[in-house]
Amino acid sequence: MEANKREIVDFGGLRSYFFPNLAHYITKNDEELFNNTSQANKLAAFVLGASKDAPGDEDILEMILPNDANAAVIAAGMDVCLLLGDKFRPKFDAAAEKLSGLGHAHDLVSVIDDDKKLGMLARKAKLKKTEDAKILQALLKVIAIDDAAEKFVELTELVSQLDLDFDVYVLTKILGLISEETSDEVDIIRDNVVNAFDSCKPLLKQLMLDGPKSEPADPFISLLMDPLEESVGKVVNHIAQLFEEASKNEGDESLVLRSQLGYQLFFLIVRSLADGKREVSKKILSGIPTSVRAEVFPGLQRSVYKSAVFLGNHIIQVLLGSKKSFEDWDVVGVAKDLESAWKRRAIAELIKKFQVSILEQCFDKPVPLIPQSPLNNDAVIDNVNKALQFALWLTEFYGSENETEALGELRFLDSTSKNLLVDSFKKFVQGINSKTHVTRIVESLEKCCLSDTPSGRKSNVQPSTSQQQDSAYTKEEMTTVHNTYSVNTKAQVLNGLSDTNSSGLLVDSKDSLSLQEISCDEVDSSTLLSSSRNIGEGVTVKAVDPVPEKVNDAQQQQTVNEIEMASDANQDTSSSASPEVAPSFSTDGWDSPTKSVALPPGMQQIDEEETTVADKDSTPQPQARAETAWGSGDATPMPLPAPTNQYKVSGFGEAKVAKGFGQFAPTSSAYGGGGGRGGYGGGDRGGRGGYGGDRGGRGGYGGGDRGGRGGYGGDRGRGGYGGRGGRGGF
């Protein structure tokens, strides 16, 4: 490993070895140190005289051994740890491991606990003339001395020999080596540092000579920073005087000012509750003149002030972690006031004012809620606000604490707050006379705690039923189909093939691993199309002709009626004048026009009917019904783009394959076996029979609207000359 070398770094005239990171920070942040000392690094502010507060150990370590330090900074920081004494020795050892990980070694790690080896190392350093040796020699002398004055003398050698005035000045302040005996010498070293700043950082020179830039202190704000018991009388009097002066005018400015002053009084009340000094709130009320009190506490609010204070203090202290006992609500009058609807409303209004006073800046400058508290002010305000919100919940849902709406309003409480409240109220209910109200509070909190657990959330889920999904389209599905109507045939088929959960247009993917099978129950014999074929635009399909199971007449009639209703709705949607339907939602929740147009999973394919179905009152226009990918009469209740002329089907009567929809096959005739859209008796979709017409076609002499499958006489014919339900021919 490479041994550490002690090298001096120059930052624009400011030389440093022990504190290179601090010197770099000071020279780069001179404006912040001068204009906003409170936001600057504590060690830097203390060294430059901008702050009188000495930095803590963590503040020092943050500067001498930063997390992202390189090997040179770590090695120098290890030397500083030795200078700062035994309490920093663990940091020295930890830094040694970190330095080793970087491929470097500190020369004092192996000898620091051996006085004999340290003495030998000091004698060798004394003989050398390098800066590295002089720094090491001074370092070893200082760590071997306990007396502060002697330490200071040895450190001054670094000033005279190496011009390390900045490092010596920093060590003097951190180690507390300034005394009456050393003050003159320290001033000289300080002047040397100031002169170094003269050429590179004049703001730092001004800071060290004149101190930090400061504004005149506001006497009222300073009074608010004093302990509450000592300052509350003066603060209330000051606010009351301003209030009375503003009351002489009735303009908007006066009303705004009086409102602000009123919230300042509420801020003081909340401060007394958060600080655990509830009796001070009584002193605040008594110190407010009658005229001011009538405006700040109108109507019933004066009557319920005590109840609002006791209730707020109780909840605030619980969420701030207090373990002390609380007065019975029956004894202090809280319970009685809560029983009255009008007094509950008055208490709620006061609690809302308490909340506003701490959430808004009532004073000209930010004022902490509890100035003497070591806790973070934002954390204190957050807990107090939650406590006041819970107190407000108690008033608004009095008597209905366990109802669903009330439980839902407790979402603002985190699990820790809920547990604190449950534990506190369980103890509280044991020592009071009337337990009904508090018991309801405990039960509601326990229900909320239970709902936060995985088992609780699971128990709230309603069991699903296995009811069959309605075959009719929903509004969202209709919207999705309309938005996908403009997509070309290839995109629609590919999207359908990619959806393994779709039903209606596509069969389940388990029936085919390499090729999706399209259910073609309205296309003629599957023996001619059992092999895969390219249907155009790079899409390959394989047709099958499943024989559907028969269903009972009642169920069949219901299914047909639902599909007809959905078909009417689809036609209305497709004929809308506006091309945009907003918003559309696909099955996976994305608002996109590229989603599959397959039917919902619960939708069933329509089986062949065995009963006669009554004609509808109004039949959709042929043009609208023909706008499907498979031709007219399609049972699939959705509009699809017009097909290309690549589709090939055959007639049931073993006619040759037609060249396209709307074209005659070479052998088709007036009694043909199912050509294209032409032919005297041919099916509109390459129908299945001859003279009798096709299953779904409109054409054919006397063909049924959903005509038969057979030849001249129909192999399964049921109907006569015409009729929508007829299966046979003439």
From Swiss-Prot:
Keyword set, alphabetical order: Developmental protein, Differentiation, Endonuclease, Hydrolase, Lyase, Methylation, Nuclease, Oogenesis, Repeat, RNA-binding
Disulfides per UniProt: none
CC terms in the record's Gene Ontology section: P granule
Active-site residues, as the UniProt record annotates them: H437 (proton acceptor)
Residue segments, region Involved in dimerization: 205-447
Enzyme type, top EC level: lyase
Effect noted on mutating H437A: Reduced catalytic activity
Annotated tissue distribution: Expressed in the germline. Expressed in most somatic cells.
The EC number(s) this enzyme carries: 4.6.1.24
Principal location: cytoplasm
Disrupted-gene phenotype: Temperature-sensitive and are only fertile at 20 degrees Celsius. 25% of progeny arresting as late embryos and 9% as larvae at 26 degrees Celsius. Surviving progeny are sterile at 26 degrees Celsius, most likely due to germline proliferation defects. The temperature-sensitive period extends from mid-larvae to young adults. Germline defects include increased apoptosis in the gonad, fewer germ nuclei, no sperm and no oocytes in the gonad arms. Double knockout with pgl-3 results in 37% of progeny arresting as late embryos and 9% as larvae at 26 degrees Celsius.
Places the protein is found: Cytoplasmic granule
A single BP term in Gene Ontology: gamete generation
Subunit note: Homodimer. Interacts with pgl-2 and pgl-3; this association is not required for P-granule localization of either pgl-2 or pgl-3. Interacts with ife-1. Interacts with prmt-1; the interaction is direct. Interacts with nmad-1. Interacts with P granule components meg-1, meg-3 and meg-4.
Function: Guanyl-specific endoribonuclease which cleaves the phosphodiester bond in single-stranded RNA between the 3'-guanylic residue and the 5'-OH residue of adjacent nucleotide, resulting in the formation of a corresponding 2',3'-cyclic phosphate intermediate. Together with the P-granule component pgl-3, is involved in the formation of P-granules. Together with pgl-3, probably recruits other granule components such as pos-1, mex-3 and glh-1 to P-granules.
Domains as described in the record: The dimerization domain also acts as a hinge; changes in its structure probably impact oligomerization and RNA-binding.
Protein name: Guanyl-specific ribonuclease pgl-1
Source organism (scientific name): Caenorhabditis elegans
Gene that produces this protein: pgl-1
